[in-house]
Swiss-Prot record:
Designated gene of the protein: rpsQ
Organism: Yersinia pseudotuberculosis serotype O:1b (strain IP 31758)
GO term, biological process aspect, one: translation
Family: Belongs to the universal ribosomal protein uS17 family.
A Pfam family: Ribosomal_S17
The protein's name in its UniProt record: Small ribosomal subunit protein uS17
Amino acid sequence: MTDQIRTLQGRVVSDKMEKSMVVAIERVVKHPIYGKFIRRTTKLHVHDENNECGIGDVVEIRECRPLSKTKSWTLVVPRKPPARLGVQ
């Protein structure tokens, strides 16, 4: 067992709950037979105490004690997505 707290970075895909959001974590894995790299997505429920993040925001989250049946991650740093060129 490690003593380090796990931190991950992902994109907010849902913020319709009070003090909660769903964050999609993407990772790249290699197919065991064909060797092609495949993108896999994991959705995690995250505690957002101040409701400060919206859909599309890139956030940093860390693991914590279980807060509910599905929530055991909390928001560390809310980061905004990079500005798109030509979009206001």
